[in-house]
Amino acid sequence: MDEQKRVALHRAKARLDAHAFYPRPVSLRGVRIWVVPWLFRLPWFRRFDGYSAWWTIAVRSRELLADETLVAHELCHVWQMQHHPVRMPLSYLLVGYARNPYEREAASV
């Protein structure tokens, strides 16, 4: 992982460490950030600048690595998955995106 990605993750972790959402702090072990502009050209992803799936964070452009709010938001989703690996993704099927409590939690960081 390059230095810019490592710094972005550590800044986001420091921001999340100020919150006590879960019993254990977010772990960066195995977490990766990928800059994948092509992904965000796909219809489902066009509305996002970042996206998380388990231990992977995808961002639209390299410049977004400097967006501490975005990276912290996506890392919060990783943290949620570390504690609720089944419930968290299923919540999007049950309540959708707009009313999802995990989205509200991530938006609060």
Regions found by a protein language model. Name each.
Residues M1-Q4, V95-Y97:
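Active-site rim elements
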